[in-house]
C-alpha cells in the first residue's frame, strides 16, 4: 500500500470507536429494540463488530454458526473474542448449520460449491433473524466497506442485516481498529475468508491482497483517479485495476433495494423518501 494511501486511511481510532458505539446504541434505542445480535466467525470483521456491540449495550447475543468447512482455528479465535467481551454462556449460542444446509441442498438437488456456499450464508441469516425476533434484538452486520464495494458478500445472506457499523471502513482500517480494540494479532493478521468451502480465502478468490484492493478502491472512488494513474501509484498491472473497478460496477444491485417498476406519481425509493427511522 502506498504510504500516501495509508496516511489517508489512518483515522483517530479512539474517536471512531466512540462514534460507532454511540451510533449502535442510538440505533437500537430509536428502533424500539432491546439489544443486538451478531454472528461471530472468528474473522477480523465479526471480531471487531462484536467488540463494538458489547461496548454499546449489555443486551447482546452472539451466534457461532460453524459448518464442516469452518477451520478449527476460526472457532478458537471466536472463543478468544467471547472471552475478550466477557460473554458468559447465556450470551452466546453455537449451532452447527450442516443439517440445515444439507436439507436445502437435497431440496435443490445440487452439490454446486457456489450454490452450497450461498445456502450457508443465507441459513446463517435466517438463524440470526429468528434469534433477533426471539429476543427483540437488531441484527448487527459485520461487512466492511471493501467487501460491500466489491460485492464480496451473499445477497440476503451476510448482506441481510439491520445495521453495518463497519460499512464505511475499508478492511485495512478494520484491522487498524481491531488492534486499537485489543483484538488478538492472530485474528488481525489472518487472511480473510467466508469459509463457505474448504480452503477458501477472499484474497485468493479476488487475486489481490486487501491493502492493494483498498488502495485501488480509495484512489478510484474517493479521489476519482484514473485507472492508469492508479496502476502507476499502486504498482499493479492495469488489468487488475480494471478488474477491481468492474467488480464494483457489476455488484451495484447488491447494494440497492429491489428495483420497483414505476407506474404511479410517487413510487417507493425513487420518490417515497422518508427517514429510515420514521416516527
From Swiss-Prot:
Binding site for ATP: 39-46, 142, 171, 193
A GO molecular function held by the record: NAD+ synthase activity
Catalyses which reaction(s): deamido-NAD(+) + NH4(+) + ATP = AMP + diphosphate + NAD(+) + H(+)
Known role: Catalyzes the ATP-dependent amidation of deamido-NAD to form NAD. Uses ammonia as a nitrogen source.
Top-tier EC class: ligase
GO cellular component assignments: cytoplasm
Protein name: NH(3)-dependent NAD(+) synthetase
Organism listed in the record: Sulfolobus acidocaldarius (strain ATCC 33909 / DSM 639 / JCM 8929 / NBRC 15157 / NCIMB 11770)
Pathway assignment: Cofactor biosynthesis; NAD(+) biosynthesis; NAD(+) from deamido-NAD(+) (ammonia route): step 1/1
SUPFAM superfamilies per the UniProt record, alphabetical: Adenine nucleotide alpha hydrolases-like (SSF52402)
Ligase among keywords: yes
Family: Belongs to the NAD synthetase family.
Keywords: ATP-binding, Ligase, Magnesium, Metal-binding, NAD, Nucleotide-binding
CDD domains named among the record's database cross-references: NAD_synthase (cd00553)
Binding positions (Mg(2+)): 45, 147
The enzyme's E.C. designation: 6.3.1.5
Subunit annotation: Homodimer.
InterPro entries the record matches: NAD/GMP_synthase (IPR022310), NAD_synthase (IPR003694), NH(3)-dep_NAD(+)_synth (IPR022926), Rossmann-like_a/b/a_fold (IPR014729)
Residues binding deamido-NAD(+), per UniProt: 122, 155, 162, 253-254
One GO term of the biological process aspect: NAD biosynthetic process
